[in-house]
Amino acid sequence: MSRPLSDQEKRKQISVRGLAGVENVTELKKNFNRHLHFTLVKDRNVATPRDYYFALAHTVRDHLVGRWIRTQQHYYEKDPKRIYYLSLEFYMGRTLQNTMVNLALENACDEATYQLGLDMEELEEIEEDAGLGNGGLGRLAACFLDSMATLGLAAYGYGIRYEFGIFNQKISGGWQMEEADVWLRYGNPWEKARPEFTLPVHFYGHVEHTSQGAKWVDTQVVLAMPYDTPVPGYRNNVVNTMRLWSAKAPNDFNLKDFNVGGYIQAVLDRNLAENIPRVLYPNDNFFEGKELRLKQEYFVVAATLQDIIRRFKSSKFGCRDPVRTNFDAFPDKVAIQLNDTHPSLAIPELMRILVDLERMDWDKAWDVTVRTCAYTNHTVLPEALERWPVHLLETLLPRHLQIIYEINQRFLNRVAATFPGDVDRLRRMSLVEEGAVKRINMAHLCIAGSHAVNGVARIHSEILKKTIFKDFYELEPHKFQNKTNGITPRRWLVLCNPGLAEVIAERIGEDFISDLDQLRKLLSFVDDEAFIRDVAKVKQENKLKFAAYLEREYKVHINPNSLFDIQVKRIHEYKRQLLNCLHVITLYNRIKREPNKFFVPRTVMIGGKAAPGHHMAKMIIRLITAIGDVVNHDPTVGDRLRVIFLENYRVSLSEKVIPAADLSEQISTAGTEASGTGNMKFMLNGALTIGTMDGANVEMAEEAGEENFFIFGMRVEDVDKLDQRGYNAQEYYDRIPELRQVIEQLSSGFFSPKQPDLFKDIVNMLMHHDRFKVFADYEDYIKCQEKVSALYKNPREWTRMVIRNIATSGKFSSDRTIAQYAREIWGVEPSRQRLPAPDEAI
């Protein structure tokens, strides 16, 4: 029998380190050991750092699975209305740290790995990003999944398990080069294959009309096999599911050829079926009408709807029948949210199932479909709107085309009855667009087939009602809503900026993590010298850490005391990275003109990927790197100005750069950025914003107060007026000497001496066909940047403004966004109730 502990020995257990929970740490170490040996079949003599990462991932995952099973059992028992979020993109990033944060395991895992002689941060860096998205739309879906779990909604994310996610960007000779993102090379410890739920998806074939109704026959079948990933809520023991579909060829695929000796070819041709989820299309805000992309869109929709209906039929429903056969209650038990038009085929597919397979009459089926579906619009750029050629649909999905024609006919009959004699309105509102190539307008299909249509920021939702969807708003104003986007504070504050989260928690407690409006309490600390000092200190630490990262990974040296001026987002003309470039060159010219004058030192960092086929976006990257080559090697400039292109911008890099930012660039032409979410991440992490009155910037400035925001440039009305008058870049070129100098430098090869005409396409675009009016905002932008520099010279005032921004960023939590979707679109009530943990009695 061991001797009892002395009082002093007992007291030694009271320590900060002890907070991890000693039995927890011991248990984690034991499980880590078990997974290393029994799951990975390695010992310490041959284990690599990657093996240690996998062992840790499996150890953490063990804490998810009990909660995951318990959550699904809870949903089966309670049979709540289920929310299905359909998206072609889920830009999840890394999972390990997020899971530890949401399960309150971070301290214990840190201690356990430390005791095992490992560095948890190094292990976290080994994980590949799940890059199954291009940018904002896919990342929004990921934030929404986190919030739906945190709010206790019975929600499921449905998408595609792409074998290759968004390409890895390499910069070579100043140009973007794309490399395949082989994110599954070493396996994915977070997913669970579910081959037992494999479902058939049909393509091609033709339609037979019988006395029983329409039959789609002689189709090619591809099997959809689901992979499930757990999505934990924040410390509430809820774990929801993201189900991503992969493709398999059926066993008899093309084997009729076998009899004539084509066995080998038939087996090789299985690849054609399995190509569907091979790669994410890397276009952001651009529609490319490729057959494979249409196959992807139908593939996810067809598999998901079968799954939804299977779950609906087999759920508890207070009746003795083995399955539910009555679809009257379907819209009361199922909500389908379409993330943009990419999953729009859900509307005709649900109609096909109800009418052709469930033998429901058209009007009833249509009522069920409309009450079930809702559509989120993400862009007003005409080149981004999906318009599928009829000939493609006719070949690939002949029955769906017939259903779309029928939907259109009935819809136009309603329009004609409401607006008699208005023929042009019928043409404008038709789902079918006539022209050289007949097309189906998928946004029109979504509006007709949904009970709710929403934009993603107040100004964007207003633009939808006044411009591109004006006719539809006049027909059915009750359908149109706004749901301003948000971000999850778990990943975008607690995980990426623990120093700031801690400083905040010391003042107002930890409840803000799942109730971000509580940040308002920080307004009473705006004049608190200790708090001002703490916030500034955390920012400086983050800047030093990021500077060290750049030095380590890219051998790039930057001045950590300079103003970190950051623009990170997809490279696109409408986001106006070119305006940023013009400012950088202007600043450079000013330093060269007055080398002895004091300039606030700046490090301008720009990052983002260009679509591989987008010539102008790739030229913009080449320009940024060329400016950097000149500026960074000019001894006159020294440490006062640096230009860095951040290679391969992705979720895991944004988690490093955003907490280090001083200035956030949100400078799209007013009326073009639907919302933006990067803007919110910077605001929450203590950067100030320079931006136009566009997207969510408008609401951010409203929350913080315009005096705490660097607003510049034309408003939407000004852009409209300029369009009416006719935008003439030459006017600005002639009138503004500094602008003229910059353009002359670009034209003359100042930044490309070996190839003087390298940037002629950029100059030509800016001078003659710039849809996004860069010159019109140049002067105001430069003046606004001068105000930024002036304030940065006063660190106390700068930090006070930062605190006001952080304190008013609560509105931009995705928890608020999702609570609004739940109440106003899905008809469900969010719940903060904690489920019992797996080791607790129910």
Swiss-Prot record:
Keywords: Acetylation, Allosteric enzyme, Carbohydrate metabolism, Glycogen metabolism, Glycosyltransferase, Nucleotide-binding, Phosphoprotein, Pyridoxal phosphate, Transferase. AMP binds at residues 43, 76, 310-319. It catalyses: [(1->4)-alpha-D-glucosyl](n) + phosphate = [(1->4)-alpha-D-glucosyl](n-1) + alpha-D-glucose 1-phosphate. Allosterically regulated through the non-covalent binding of metabolites, being activated by AMP and inhibited by ATP, ADP, and glucose-6-phosphate. The activity is also controlled by post-translational modifications including phosphorylation. Phosphorylation of Ser-15 converts phosphorylase B (unphosphorylated) to phosphorylase A. The modification N6-(pyridoxal phosphate)lysine is found at residue 681. The record marks 156 as: May be involved in allosteric control. It holds the Pfam family Phosphorylase. Its cofactor is pyridoxal 5'-phosphate. InterPro entries: Glycg_phsphrylas, Glyco_trans_35, Pyridoxal_P_attach_site. GO terms for molecular function: glycogen phosphorylase activity; nucleotide binding; pyridoxal phosphate binding. It is an enzyme of class 2 (transferase). One of its GO terms (cellular component) is cytoplasm. Its EC number is 2.4.1.1. The modification Phosphotyrosine is found at residues 204, 227, 473. CDD domains: GT35_Glycogen_Phosphorylase. It comes from the Eukaryota. The record marks 109, 143 as: Involved in the association of subunits. One of its GO terms (biological process) is glycogen catabolic process. Homodimer. Homotetramer; to form the enzymatically active phosphorylase A. Allosteric enzyme that catalyzes the rate-limiting step in glycogen catabolism, the phosphorolytic cleavage of glycogen to produce glucose-1-phosphate, and plays a central role in maintaining cellular and organismal glucose homeostasis. This is Glycogen phosphorylase, muscle form. It comes from Macaca fascicularis (Crab-eating macaque). The lineage of its organism: Eukaryota, Metazoa, Chordata, Craniata, Vertebrata. The gene is PYGM.
